């Protein structure tokens, strides 16, 4: 299956929800104010967000749609153009390119978003692109997390740096970076605990890990990725706000898009925060993390069902 086919299949539920919803609303050849308001309300209910939905409504109202043409298809095209203008600047295809120098990526996210699995899939892409990879098992609060990351390291051929459950996460990160330096390994992916007892502990732990990383290399971490679960809908906006208070988020990966009609939340979060999008999780297989491509996303999200 090609990449675009994966995008289309992954966004099938979201695209069907959008196209069928628009068909129900648009029953007249002319788009009047009542129809515009219904379109805006529908987009908001589809997790596209208030700001983006309002802008899309304004664009539709300014464009004169030919009554002879299919109004739903025309509005779908307006939506596609809006997505492209918004999201092309947020592509980060360079993230996966082979690096000559040390590149440390701190990976964050709440429990259950598929963070450790995502690290494994990133590692697979890095390896396929010719990079040597280290996984740093800094979620030391759960023995299962260490075991899971070790399993992924075996699958993709990455080196794993780990310690006993309950060990200091920052010390594991330090050892991983030192090992990378000593062995000329360019890519270090650091897994972190999804959730601690309270926000202060989470903030302190993240700050400690980040500070230790910076002591080993003043330019690190080069990236701080937040993994988000698309099925959480608008809740992911709160997650981004909270994690960004702890440490500046430089990229997003959204998982579980194949199992939800809430793909519109990616538009909402892009409009509000302009954080680059690294990749999209469109399935459970090792190759189902797709490098974000705005055109493929726009095509898949607005495919007419």
Residue locations for each model-derived region?
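Charged, compositionally biased N-terminal leader segments and the immediate start
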Residues: 1-27
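Alpha-solenoid HEAT/Armadillo repeat architecture
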Residues: 12, 44, 65, 214, ...
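Conserved catalytic-core segment of NTP-binding enzymes
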Residues: 148, 169-183, 198-303
């Amino acid at each position: 299956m090609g990449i675009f086919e994966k995008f289309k299949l992954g966004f099938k539920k979201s695209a069907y929800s959008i196209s069928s919803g628009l068909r129900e609303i648009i029953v007249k050849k002319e788009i009047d104010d009542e129809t515009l308001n219904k379109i805006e309300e529908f987009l908001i209910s589809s997790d596209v967000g208030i700001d983006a939905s309002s802008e899309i409504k304004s664009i539709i109202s300014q464009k004169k749609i030919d009554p002879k043409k299919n109004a739903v298809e025309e509005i779908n095209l307006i939506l596609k153009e809006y997505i492209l203008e918004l999201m092309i600047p947020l592509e980060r295809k360079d993230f996966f390119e082979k690096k000559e120098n040390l590149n440390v990526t701190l990976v964050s996210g709440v429990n259950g978003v598929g963070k450790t699995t995502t690290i494994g899939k990133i590692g697979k892409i890095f390896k396929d692109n010719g990079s040597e990879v280290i996984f740093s098992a800094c979620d030391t609060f759960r023995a299962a997390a260490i075991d899971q990351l070790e399993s992924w390291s075996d699958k993709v051929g990455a080196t794993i740096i780990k310690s006993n459950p309950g060990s200091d996460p920052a010390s594991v990160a330090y050892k991983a970076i030192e090992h990378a330096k000593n062995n000329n390994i360019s890519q270090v992916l650091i897994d972190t605990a999804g959730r601690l007892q309270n926000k202060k502990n989470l903030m302190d732990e993240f700050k400690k890990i980040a500070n230790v990383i910076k002591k080993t290399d003043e330019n690190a971490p080069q990236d701080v990725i937040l993994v988000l679960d698309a099925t959480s809908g608008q809740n992911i906006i709160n997650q981004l706000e909270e994690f960004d208070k702890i440490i500046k988020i430089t990229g997003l990966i959204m998982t579980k898009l194949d199992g939800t009609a809430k793909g519109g939340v990616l538009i909402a979060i892009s409009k509000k925060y302009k954080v680059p999008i690294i990749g999209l999780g469109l399935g459970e297989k090792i190759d189902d993390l797709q490098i974000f491509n705005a055109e493929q996303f726009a095509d898949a999200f607005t495919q007419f069902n």
